[in-house]
Amino acid sequence: GNPIIGEGKPENQNHAIIFCHGQYLQTLDMNQDNYLGEAYKMRNLLEGFTGNVRIIGFREHIFSESGGAVAHFAASNELVFGTMVQRFLAWPLRVRFHYGHPDVWDKVWAFSSGGVSKASRTLHVSEDIFGGLNAVLRGGEVEYEEYIHCGKARDITFTAANAFEQKISGGNAFQGLSRDFYRAGKSFDLFRLLSLYNTGTGLFASSTIMFWALYWFTLTIACLALIGLENFTVDTQGNLYSDLGRGGAQGDSQVYSAEWLIQLGFIMIW
Protein backbone atom coordinates (compact mmCIF):
# COMPACT_ATOMS: atom_id res chain seq x y z
CA GLY A 1 0.00 0.00 0.00
CA ASN A 2 0.86 3.67 0.04
CA PRO A 3 3.51 4.28 2.72
CA ILE A 4 2.42 7.90 3.10
CA ILE A 5 -0.59 7.88 5.43
CA GLY A 6 -1.01 11.61 6.02
CA GLU A 7 0.00 14.75 4.16
CA GLY A 8 3.34 14.40 2.41
CA LYS A 9 5.16 17.46 3.72
CA PRO A 10 4.58 16.98 7.48
CA GLU A 11 5.16 13.24 7.13
CA ASN A 12 8.58 13.91 5.60
CA GLN A 13 9.40 16.58 8.18
CA ASN A 14 8.67 14.47 11.23
CA HIS A 15 10.34 11.40 9.76
CA ALA A 16 13.52 13.35 8.93
CA ILE A 17 13.99 14.64 12.49
CA ILE A 18 15.61 11.38 13.59
CA PHE A 19 18.35 11.85 10.98
CA CYS A 20 19.21 15.42 12.01
CA HIS A 21 22.30 16.20 14.06
CA GLY A 22 22.68 18.90 16.67
CA GLN A 23 20.40 20.42 19.26
CA TYR A 24 18.41 22.80 17.05
CA LEU A 25 16.47 22.40 13.83
CA GLN A 26 15.50 24.96 11.19
CA THR A 27 12.56 24.40 8.84
CA LEU A 28 13.19 25.45 5.24
CA ASP A 29 11.46 25.44 1.87
CA MET A 30 12.96 24.32 -1.43
CA ASN A 31 13.05 27.91 -2.72
CA GLN A 32 14.69 29.24 0.44
CA ASP A 33 17.85 31.33 0.33
CA ASN A 34 20.32 32.68 2.87
CA TYR A 35 23.13 35.19 3.04
CA LEU A 36 26.59 34.88 4.54
CA GLY A 37 26.19 38.02 6.64
CA GLU A 38 22.94 36.72 8.11
CA ALA A 39 24.43 33.30 8.79
CA TYR A 40 26.92 34.91 11.18
CA LYS A 41 23.95 35.99 13.33
CA MET A 42 22.65 32.46 13.81
CA ARG A 43 24.81 31.94 16.89
CA ASN A 44 23.16 34.95 18.54
CA LEU A 45 19.74 33.61 17.58
CA LEU A 46 20.40 30.24 19.20
CA GLU A 47 21.29 32.00 22.45
CA GLY A 48 17.59 32.83 22.71
CA PHE A 49 16.70 29.24 23.57
CA THR A 50 16.52 29.75 27.30
CA GLY A 51 13.90 28.55 29.74
CA ASN A 52 10.84 27.17 27.98
CA VAL A 53 11.50 28.72 24.56
CA ARG A 54 10.81 26.03 21.93
CA ILE A 55 10.51 28.05 18.72
CA ILE A 56 12.24 31.21 17.50
CA GLY A 57 11.00 32.81 14.31
CA PHE A 58 12.39 35.63 12.22
CA ARG A 59 11.53 37.53 9.07
CA GLU A 60 12.17 36.79 5.41
CA HIS A 61 13.31 38.83 2.43
CA ILE A 62 11.16 38.05 -0.63
CA PHE A 63 13.54 38.18 -3.60
CA SER A 64 10.89 37.30 -6.21
CA GLU A 65 9.17 40.69 -5.89
CA SER A 66 10.25 41.84 -9.36
CA GLY A 67 8.53 38.92 -11.11
CA GLY A 68 5.38 40.89 -11.96
CA ALA A 69 2.28 42.43 -10.41
CA VAL A 70 1.19 39.20 -8.70
CA ALA A 71 4.71 38.61 -7.40
CA HIS A 72 4.79 42.15 -6.02
CA PHE A 73 1.46 41.58 -4.27
CA ALA A 74 2.61 38.26 -2.79
CA ALA A 75 5.87 39.81 -1.61
CA SER A 76 4.07 42.76 0.00
CA ASN A 77 1.64 40.39 1.69
CA GLU A 78 4.50 38.32 3.10
CA LEU A 79 6.37 41.47 4.18
CA VAL A 80 3.42 42.65 6.27
CA PHE A 81 2.72 39.25 7.80
CA GLY A 82 6.35 38.31 8.36
CA THR A 83 7.31 41.54 10.12
CA MET A 84 4.60 43.73 11.63
CA VAL A 85 1.94 41.04 12.14
CA GLN A 86 4.18 38.32 13.58
CA ARG A 87 5.93 40.84 15.82
CA PHE A 88 2.57 41.74 17.34
CA LEU A 89 1.44 38.11 17.51
CA ALA A 90 4.49 37.20 19.57
CA TRP A 91 4.04 40.09 21.99
CA PRO A 92 1.76 41.26 23.52
CA LEU A 93 -0.87 38.90 22.06
CA ARG A 94 1.22 35.75 22.72
CA VAL A 95 -0.53 33.81 19.97
CA ARG A 96 2.32 33.32 17.51
CA PHE A 97 2.84 29.63 16.86
CA HIS A 98 4.75 27.92 14.05
CA TYR A 99 4.28 29.08 10.46
CA GLY A 100 6.84 26.88 8.71
CA HIS A 101 9.95 28.48 7.25
CA PRO A 102 12.25 29.82 8.60
CA ASP A 103 11.48 29.03 12.27
CA VAL A 104 14.16 27.38 14.40
CA TRP A 105 13.08 24.59 16.77
CA ASP A 106 14.49 23.06 19.89
CA LYS A 107 15.13 19.73 18.16
CA VAL A 108 15.65 17.74 21.34
CA TRP A 109 12.22 18.81 22.57
CA ALA A 110 10.47 18.33 19.21
CA PHE A 111 12.05 14.89 18.82
CA SER A 112 10.26 13.61 21.91
CA SER A 113 7.10 15.73 21.94
CA GLY A 114 5.19 15.23 18.72
CA GLY A 115 7.41 16.70 16.02
CA VAL A 116 7.26 20.05 14.25
CA SER A 117 3.87 19.55 12.55
CA LYS A 118 0.83 17.27 12.35
CA ALA A 119 0.03 15.18 9.33
CA SER A 120 -3.58 13.98 9.47
CA ARG A 121 -4.97 14.13 5.96
CA THR A 122 -7.71 16.72 5.32
CA LEU A 123 -7.84 18.01 8.91
CA HIS A 124 -4.29 19.36 9.13
CA VAL A 125 -4.29 21.45 5.96
CA SER A 126 -2.22 24.09 7.76
CA GLU A 127 0.06 21.51 9.29
CA ASP A 128 2.71 23.86 10.70
CA ILE A 129 0.53 25.81 13.11
CA PHE A 130 -0.44 22.61 14.93
CA GLY A 131 3.19 21.96 15.75
CA GLY A 132 3.51 25.41 17.32
CA LEU A 133 0.21 25.05 19.16
CA ASN A 134 1.34 21.69 20.48
CA ALA A 135 4.48 23.35 21.84
CA VAL A 136 2.47 26.11 23.53
CA LEU A 137 -0.04 23.68 25.06
CA ARG A 138 2.87 21.73 26.54
CA GLY A 139 4.16 24.83 28.31
CA GLY A 140 6.56 26.07 25.65
CA GLU A 141 7.10 29.65 24.48
CA VAL A 142 7.53 31.13 21.01
CA GLU A 143 9.84 34.09 20.36
CA TYR A 144 10.28 36.33 17.33
CA GLU A 145 13.45 38.21 16.35
CA GLU A 146 13.97 40.91 13.74
CA TYR A 147 17.74 41.36 13.58
CA ILE A 148 18.16 38.39 11.26
CA HIS A 149 16.45 37.36 8.04
CA CYS A 150 16.78 34.94 5.15
CA GLY A 151 15.64 34.88 1.54
CA LYS A 152 12.44 33.35 0.21
CA ALA A 153 10.63 33.19 -3.13
CA ARG A 154 6.88 33.60 -3.34
CA ASP A 155 4.20 32.94 -5.96
CA ILE A 156 4.59 34.84 -9.23
CA THR A 157 1.43 33.64 -11.02
CA PHE A 158 -2.19 34.32 -10.21
CA THR A 159 -3.09 30.61 -10.14
CA ALA A 160 -0.39 29.80 -7.59
CA ALA A 161 -1.24 32.81 -5.42
CA ASN A 162 -4.94 31.95 -5.50
CA ALA A 163 -4.22 28.32 -4.58
CA PHE A 164 -2.10 29.48 -1.65
CA GLU A 165 -4.88 31.75 -0.36
CA GLN A 166 -7.35 28.88 -0.67
CA LYS A 167 -5.03 26.65 1.33
CA ILE A 168 -4.68 29.26 4.08
CA SER A 169 -8.42 29.92 4.35
CA GLY A 170 -9.27 26.21 4.23
CA GLY A 171 -6.65 25.48 6.87
CA ASN A 172 -8.14 28.07 9.19
CA ALA A 173 -11.59 26.55 8.74
CA PHE A 174 -10.33 23.11 9.78
CA GLN A 175 -8.48 24.60 12.73
CA GLY A 176 -11.84 25.34 14.30
CA LEU A 177 -12.67 21.60 14.14
CA SER A 178 -9.45 20.39 15.75
CA ARG A 179 -9.07 19.26 19.34
CA ASP A 180 -5.87 21.29 19.60
CA PHE A 181 -7.72 24.59 19.34
CA TYR A 182 -10.44 23.25 21.61
CA ARG A 183 -7.82 22.61 24.28
CA ALA A 184 -6.29 26.03 23.66
CA GLY A 185 -9.68 27.64 24.12
CA LYS A 186 -10.08 25.95 27.50
CA SER A 187 -6.60 26.83 28.76
CA PHE A 188 -6.03 30.40 27.46
CA ASP A 189 -7.14 33.49 29.35
CA LEU A 190 -9.83 35.70 27.81
CA PHE A 191 -7.44 38.21 26.22
CA ARG A 192 -5.30 35.49 24.69
CA LEU A 193 -8.36 33.53 23.57
CA LEU A 194 -9.85 36.53 21.75
CA SER A 195 -6.45 37.20 20.19
CA LEU A 196 -6.31 33.60 18.98
CA TYR A 197 -9.76 33.85 17.41
CA ASN A 198 -9.29 37.21 15.71
CA THR A 199 -5.89 36.30 14.27
CA GLY A 200 -7.04 32.94 12.95
CA THR A 201 -10.50 31.65 12.13
CA GLY A 202 -12.18 34.86 13.24
CA LEU A 203 -10.27 36.89 10.66
CA PHE A 204 -11.92 35.01 7.81
CA ALA A 205 -15.33 35.03 9.50
CA SER A 206 -15.11 38.80 10.00
CA SER A 207 -13.94 39.30 6.41
CA THR A 208 -16.90 37.31 5.09
CA ILE A 209 -19.35 39.38 7.16
CA MET A 210 -17.65 42.59 6.04
CA PHE A 211 -17.84 41.67 2.34
CA TRP A 212 -21.53 40.75 2.55
CA ALA A 213 -22.25 43.92 4.53
CA LEU A 214 -20.52 45.95 1.83
CA TYR A 215 -22.65 44.35 -0.90
CA TRP A 216 -25.89 44.98 0.99
CA PHE A 217 -24.83 48.50 1.92
CA THR A 218 -24.17 49.38 -1.73
CA LEU A 219 -27.48 47.84 -2.81
CA THR A 220 -29.41 49.71 -0.10
CA ILE A 221 -27.82 53.04 -1.00
CA ALA A 222 -28.72 52.46 -4.65
CA CYS A 223 -32.34 51.68 -3.74
CA LEU A 224 -32.60 54.78 -1.54
CA ALA A 225 -31.24 56.91 -4.36
CA LEU A 226 -33.82 55.51 -6.78
CA ILE A 227 -36.74 56.41 -4.47
CA GLY A 228 -35.40 59.87 -3.65
CA LEU A 229 -34.11 59.26 -0.12
CA GLU A 230 -30.48 60.18 -0.66
CA ASN A 231 -30.84 62.76 2.13
CA PHE A 232 -33.24 63.08 5.06
CA THR A 233 -34.00 65.76 7.62
CA VAL A 234 -34.21 65.41 11.40
CA ASP A 235 -35.90 68.16 13.43
CA THR A 236 -35.16 69.09 17.04
CA GLN A 237 -37.72 66.53 18.31
CA GLY A 238 -35.96 63.71 16.48
CA ASN A 239 -38.64 63.32 13.80
CA LEU A 240 -37.42 61.98 10.46
CA TYR A 241 -38.48 63.60 7.16
CA SER A 242 -37.58 62.98 3.57
CA ASP A 243 -36.18 66.00 1.75
CA LEU A 244 -38.36 64.98 -1.17
CA GLY A 245 -41.54 65.57 0.80
CA ARG A 246 -40.42 68.50 2.95
CA GLY A 247 -38.39 70.54 0.53
CA GLY A 248 -35.11 70.54 2.44
CA ALA A 249 -34.04 71.59 5.92
CA GLN A 250 -36.15 74.12 7.83
CA GLY A 251 -35.43 76.02 11.02
CA ASP A 252 -33.21 74.13 13.43
CA SER A 253 -33.47 70.91 11.44
CA GLN A 254 -30.31 69.08 10.35
CA VAL A 255 -29.75 67.29 7.05
CA TYR A 256 -28.04 63.89 7.02
CA SER A 257 -27.06 61.49 4.28
CA ALA A 258 -28.72 58.10 4.01
CA GLU A 259 -25.50 56.41 5.16
CA TRP A 260 -26.14 57.75 8.67
CA LEU A 261 -29.46 55.95 8.85
CA ILE A 262 -28.03 52.63 7.68
CA GLN A 263 -24.99 52.78 9.97
CA LEU A 264 -27.08 53.70 13.05
CA GLY A 265 -25.58 57.16 13.06
CA PHE A 266 -28.57 58.45 15.03
CA ILE A 267 -26.78 57.36 18.18
CA MET A 268 -24.70 60.53 17.86
CA ILE A 269 -27.86 62.64 17.71
CA TRP A 270 -29.40 61.39 20.94
PLM feature spans:
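Basic/Trp-rich segment in TM-proximal cytosolic loops or flexible interdomain/linker regions
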Residues: 158, 167-270
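Internal catalytic domains of large membrane-associated glycosyltransferases
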Residues: 1-208
